Amino acid sequence: MAQTSAVEKNKRREKLVKRHAVKRARLKAIVMDQGLPLEERFRATIRLAELPRNSAKVRIRNRCEVSGRPRGYYRKLKMSRIALRQLGSLGQIPGVVKSSW
């Protein structure tokens, strides 16, 4: 089980990303637009830098929804390899069967 504080910190980051997503996207579009004057693009860069660091999507860590584990994460299932194995062995994930050959 992951530390509760780490899981909660990641949840706070997700909320911040959601709150600032539109503003951040608008500013990034201005910065990347080569047709705009350099001064306007520079001002947009400064305003982008003033946003909270944790409002960047890059700062979010994929975590297992069962255990909170940050490593060995399967994106499709949103869980770690360990949780997948445990729940798969118990038959709680539809369509997952133990392999044998």
Swiss-Prot record:
GO terms for biological process: translation. It comes from the Bacteria. Keywords: Ribonucleoprotein, Ribosomal protein, RNA-binding, rRNA-binding. The keyword Repeat does not apply. Pfam families: Ribosomal_S14. Gene3D superfamilies: 1.10.287.1480. InterPro entries: Ribosomal_uS14, Ribosomal_uS14_bac/plastid, Ribosomal_uS14_CS. GO terms for molecular function: rRNA binding; structural constituent of ribosome. One of its GO terms (cellular component) is small ribosomal subunit. SUPFAM superfamilies: Glucocorticoid receptor-like (DNA-binding domain). Transmembrane segments: none annotated. The keyword rRNA-binding applies. Binds 16S rRNA, required for the assembly of 30S particles and may also be responsible for determining the conformation of the 16S rRNA at the A site. PANTHER family: 30S RIBOSOMAL PROTEIN S14, SMALL RIBOSOMAL SUBUNIT PROTEIN US14M. Part of the 30S ribosomal subunit. Contacts proteins S3 and S10. Belongs to the universal ribosomal protein uS14 family. HAMAP family: Ribosomal_uS14_1. This is Small ribosomal subunit protein uS14. It comes from Brucella abortus (strain 2308).
